[in-house]
Regions:
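Residue patterns forming the tRNA-binding/recognition surfaces of aminoacyl-tRNA synthetases
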Residues: 1-151, 168-169, 232, 264, ...
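Acidic, turn-prone loop/beta-hairpin segments
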Residues: 188, 332-360, 391-418
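Alpha-helical recognition segments enriched in aromatics with Gly/Pro capping
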Residues: 8-20, 126-128, 147-300
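Short, amphipathic alpha-helical segments that act as regulatory/interfacial helices
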Residues: 237, 315, 319-326
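Short, contiguous acidic/charged loop-to-helix segments that flank catalytic cores in large enzymes
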Residues: 210-213, 221-228, 309, 403-414
Length: 418
């Protein structure tokens, strides 16, 4: 109704007071609670012979998430950040293309959100939060906010915290000699709205990157769950572009959320929750770390006892491979016993070639934040190339050759390089 009214230039009509009753200018029903008035309105329409039909329909209706009571939407004065008057939308869309989005579909997601979003409603009606530092003339309702008034609030907040806004009246909070530009009055009242919490988090780049000497703008990366394209990534982009003209980050990485082995959300009522403490107690912290590193975080990340058991076996194979190599260095002096690669056998040079390939895969994966690729490359190298092939072949050299034999030193050098 509101959108249709705006389209045809109709006045924004909001006849409901803050306490949920019709305002006095509503004929017949002024002062009556809106939901109790439904029956009265039906009776009045019937009495005026204007009620064509009355029936119940099952439909979706907004309810309070906390108390489950029905709610209504009211048109009330709010503070907004315009997306178009100063070109914020266009500039933000341009800056999106300067950022590395990981995974790449994140770019399309946030681009579509910024492209189609309405103006940002900045104000909230809550009991406590970060106040909007604005004053209103009590005589003509003119808004009062100046550089001097903002500086005064900044000084008070620095000394007393934002609680001072709620504890003191407007006279204490305003600079001396403040006058209304509309009527010249010196009587003001505070604005009672607080800032949207997404504005609070959205300016963290200014609070952190500009206040800490060892940091600089923009941040190398913002990392959060995929829901933050609508949240932190979104608000940070708008506040940074609005203030500096540039995105606050070089890259944005988003991850999915932990689900069970069937892809279902973790829930105590379903009984599919896997607690980290129980994994650490049974398998050790390294297995939990390996699970995190092995998962492709771009989508939902599955976890279950069966998955952890498989990762535990993989961890044991990697660890045992390393233990075998470390166990053969007792008589090996790096300073005196290292061998030249060009003096080694084809087998030794081959495994070093395989190592070089694996290192290349891992370095490339690190650059792309594809940690699961690193796990798979490392696991395959340990199990296939080393344990089942190279280490199995060189056991004779290690166990039967004299301590200083060239072949034995070649094998030790290769293992040391690995």
């Amino acid at each position: 109704d509101h959108v249709a009214g705006r389209k045809y230039g109709l006045e924004c009509y909001s006849p409901v007071e803050d306490n949920g009753v019709f305002s006095d200018d509503v004929q017949f029903f002024g002062g009556e609670f809106i939901f109790k008035a439904n029956a009265t309105i039906n009776e009045k329409l019937k009495a005026l012979n204007l009620l064509l039909k009355n029936e119940n329909l099952a439909h979706s209706y907004p309810h309070c998430w906390r108390c489950k009571k029905p709610v209504i939407y009211r048109a009330t004065p709010q503070w907004f950040i315009s997306m178009d008057k100063m070109g914020l939308r266009e500039k933000s869309l341009e800056q999106i293309n300067t950022v590395q989005w990981i995974p790449s579909w994140g770019r399309e997601r946030i681009y579509s959100m910024i492209e189609n979003r309405p103006d940002w409603c900045l104000s909230r009606q809550r009991s406590w939060g970060v106040p909007i530092p604005v004053f209103h003339c009590t005589k003509c309702s003119e808004i009062y906010v100046t550089r001097e008034s903002v500086d005064k609030i900044h000084q008070l907040f620095t000394k007393h915290s934002s609680d001072i806004w709620f504890e003191k009246d407007a006279r204490f909070l305003m600079p001396e000699g403040a006058q209304c530009s509309g009527c010249g009055s010196t009587e003001f009242k505070k604005d009672h709205n607080i800032l949207d919490i997404w504005f609070d988090s959205g300016i963290s780049h200014a609070a952190v990157l500009e206040e800490r000497g060892n940091l600089s703008r923009p941040a190398d990366m913002y990392l959060e769950g995929s829901d933050q394209h609508r949240g932190w990534f979104h608000s940070s982009l708008l506040t940074a572009v609005g203030r500096t003209g540039n995105a606050p980050y070089k890259a944005v990485l988003t991850h999915g959320f932990v689900v069970d082995e069937n892809g279902r959300k973790m829930s105590k009522s379903v009984g599919n929750v896997v607690a980290p403490d129980s994994i650490i107690k049974q398998y050790g912290a390294d297995v939990l770390r390996l699970w995190a590193a092995s998962a492709d975080y771009k989508a939902g990340i599955s976890i279950s006892d069966n998955i952890i058991r498989q990762l535990s076996d993989a961890y044991r194979r990697i660890r045992n491979t390393c233990r075998f190599m470390l166990g053969n260095f007792d008589d090996f002096n790096v300073m005196t016993d290292m061998r030249q690669i060009n003096q080694m056998s084809e087998l030794d040079r081959f495994i070093l070639h395989r190592l070089h390939r694996v290192v290349g895969i891992c370095l490339s994966a690190y650059e792309k934040y594809e940690f699961h690729t690193i796990y798979h490359a490392l696991h395959n190298f340990c199990v296939v190339d080393l344990s089942s092939f190279y280490l199995d072949i060189i056991k004779d050299r290690l166990y039967t050759s004299p301590a200083g034999a060239p072949g034995r030193r070649d094998a030790q050098t290769v293992m040391f390089i690995i």
